[in-house]
Amino acid sequence: MKRLRHILQSKHLIKIITIIIFIITLLYTNYYPFKSKYTKNDKEFIGIVTKYEVKEDKITIEIKAKEKLLITYKYQDKEFNNLSYGDKIKVKGTLITPSKNTNQNTFNYQKYLYYKKIYYLVEATSINKIANNHNYLYTIKNILYQKIDKLKSSNYIKTLLFCDNTLSKEIKESYRINGISHLFSVSGMHINFFVSIIYLYLNKITYNKRIKYLITNIFIIIYLILFPSSSLLRSAVMSILYSINYLLKLKIKKIDILLLTLGVSLLINPFIIYDLGYIYSYTITFFLVLSSSTLKKKNKINKIIYISLLSFLVSIPITIYNSFEINIISILLNIILVPIISIIILPLTILTYIFPILDSILYLFTNTLETISLFISKINITKIIFPKPSLLIVVLQSIDTFN
């Protein structure tokens, strides 16, 4: 153990390993020929339901077949209320190649799906369930979802607890414009909150820290498997590495743990390097870790202001690169909303899940938040439009922000 500790405490080892993994990831994701296992002539597909969303006259389903497929099906007289995660279905339809962006600097839907390893869309003509779910993890997921399906605030419970952002496009776009969309991603704040609750109960059972860390890490891993997301992966890996570092007394620096987090995340999912949610989450966390000594000297109010300001500043280059605009009111919104969401809305979301009678209160908060966000997003005077910068400029701007 002493030898391992000595190796990991090496000044440059972790940095070199992370850089090597990063370079290999770039080469692998850009030059390895990823191809679909299907051909355009295929008309029938059998797979397991991993995601689905039912609207008035359309259902969108993601299935795990020979590869991931995204299915859309318009129906008139058939309902899909009996569909569950883990069900095996047979789909008949036509394979469609996802559309590319028509303008160079606009959203590329084909590339977005490619990074999720989805190469084809399916326009379904029929969908039939051929077997019910028998997977224990999917059963847990179904039970968790069934409890909230009829609640008015179910979309926010799914978003804040289950990494399933089912908010309307209009609302999501207003949050993006106002620079607060990251507040609705399951991240370190959520993990810390859940771990604190688990610790609160475990303190009544045992004082053994190893057992506490083991149980919380098992919870985090199951949580990640049930509700996979890019920002959650970063938070989960980092939390587990922190606990290993503490238990084994490896004395690895925080910044090196963060670099290890990137390396492990890329080994788990190489394409996460292109995920905007992960880029935001990791970049903001990276600069917060670098600023940890400064944060320790500040009181709670100043800490919230500092975190909000730093998060906004370091995310500016990323936002400009992807959206070509920033909203200067984002600073104020983050300062106001970070404590509201972390102290009021997130705990209330958990309580509403446990006690559905609180649904109307949570709905009042979230509906008010949506109304304010929609109003502010339409104020053009606070928006600044930029030409798309090069990637090098984005990196240099981020470094300069911290300096």
Explain the meaning of each model-derived region:
Residues K2-I14, L26-Y38, K51, K55-D57, ...:
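C-terminal regulatory/interaction regions
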Residues K37-K40, E62-A65, L144-L151, Y201-I205, ...:
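Alpha-helix C-terminal capping segments
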Residues K2-I7, I19-H182:
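Membrane-interface helix/helix-cap signal primarily in integral membrane proteins
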Residues G47, G93, L160, S187, ...:
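Divalent metal-coordination and catalytic microenvironments
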Residues K129-Y138, N155-T166, L226-L232, L250-L258, ...:
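Hydrophobic alpha-helical transmembrane segments
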Residues F287-S390:
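Alpha-helical transmembrane segments of multi-pass integral membrane proteins
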Residues R5-H12, I16-I20, V122, K172-S330, ...:
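Hydrophobic alpha-helical transmembrane segments in multi-pass membrane proteins
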